[in-house]
Amino acid sequence: MTDLPPHALQPAEPVSVEQHMALSSLFTTLEDLTAWSRKHSLWPFNFGLSCCYVEQVTALTPVYDQARFGAEVIRASPRQADLLVVSGTVFHKMAAPLLRLYEQMRAPRWVIAMGACACSGGMYDIYSVVQGVDRFIPVDVYIPGCPPRPEAMLDALIMLQQQVGSERRPLGVTVGNSAGLGFDAPRRRDERHDQRMAQTLLDPPETL
């Protein structure tokens, strides 16, 4: 027979109904529950342009384990993502495609600018480089450095999670008129359908 301490042989004290409810029930509001779920289930879409992207993907390795923060599901399409991570030098040629990718993301959406080039243009103060990605899309968290370490990416995720968890959005953002998930805003695909179908000439690449 295994030797047990004397208190282990004593019968457990009965648990009251109030104590049982406190241990097994959760009381919250829909806004708080929505913010909590968004905070711990960010779906990033990586837009890597240069050396900072190497440090960004390093944060996904087992050494740093970005999965601890619920942001390891890298999406291949911006339509399935709510977090855009821009890392590297943003040239003017890439500004228009990057803006289109941002517009394709479903709201609510957030942006992280990783590296000095994405934050402010870095050392490239020249005509061909955008001096900060916030010139044409809003940025929520900036990660300075050339390049920043993977730990900085994890710190940015923590800061963004705190920001997302503190946001309180109206119920209409979560539950539409038909009680289904989604937004009541019209889709850009539907808005531009007639215009795209009537277009017969394509713009040259240098005008984009």
From Swiss-Prot:
Record keyword Cell membrane present: yes
Catalytic activity, EC: 7.1.1.-
Residue spans of biased composition, Basic and acidic residues class: 185-196
Biological processes annotated in GO: aerobic respiration; electron transport coupled proton transport
Annotated residues for binding of [4Fe-4S] cluster: C51, C52, C117, C146
Keywords: 4Fe-4S, Cell inner membrane, Cell membrane, Iron, Iron-sulfur, Membrane, Metal-binding, NAD, Quinone, Translocase, Transport, Ubiquinone
Annotated compartments: Cell inner membrane
Domain of life: Bacteria
Reactions performed catalytically: a quinone + NADH + 5 H(+)(in) = a quinol + NAD(+) + 4 H(+)(out)
Name of the featured protein: NADH-quinone oxidoreductase subunit B
Organism: Rhodopseudomonas palustris (strain HaA2)
Upper classification of the organism: Bacteria, Pseudomonadati, Pseudomonadota, Alphaproteobacteria, Hyphomicrobiales
